[in-house]
Amino acid sequence: MKKISKLRGMQDIEPLQAKKYDFIEMEFNSISKSYGYDEVRFPILENTELFKRSVGDESDIVNKEMFTFESKSGKSMTMRPEGTAGSMRMAIENGLLDSGQQRISYKGPMFRYERPQKGRSRQFQQLSLEAYGFNAVSYTHLTLPTKA
C-alpha cells in the first residue's frame, strides 16, 4: 500500500513548534490589544474575484500563485493568499467601518502555490495589523519576537 504524506509545501506543526507558535501568537495578541487593535477572523476560502480585484487581475499572485478551484455549483473559490483583501471585505460587509476608524488584527494560515524552498512554504502563517479610516497615517512600530 502506498504511503500517504502531506502535500508538497504544506506544514505539519509538531508539539514543540506549536508551543513556539502559541508564544508568538500570545505576544502578538497582547501587544496588538494594548495598541487598540481588535481581533477579527474571516474565512480561509473567499470568492476568487475578491483577489483579482484587490491585487490585480494580471498580478503574479492571481495568475501563478493562488490555490483556486470551482465549487460543485461552479463558483470560483480561492484559498486566501494574503489577509488584507479578506479583512477589508469583512470590514465593509459587516459594517465595521461605519463608525469611521477601525483598528483590527488577524492571524492565520495563508496559501500560495509557489515553488517550495528553504524559508518559503505553500502554507504559511501571517500575523497582521490593519488600520482603516484614519486621515493622517501615524505609524506605531510594534516589535514582535521572530524567534521563540
Model-found features: residue ranges?
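TRNA-recognition modules of translation machinery and tRNA-sensing kinases, especially anticodon-binding
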Residues: 1-142, 147
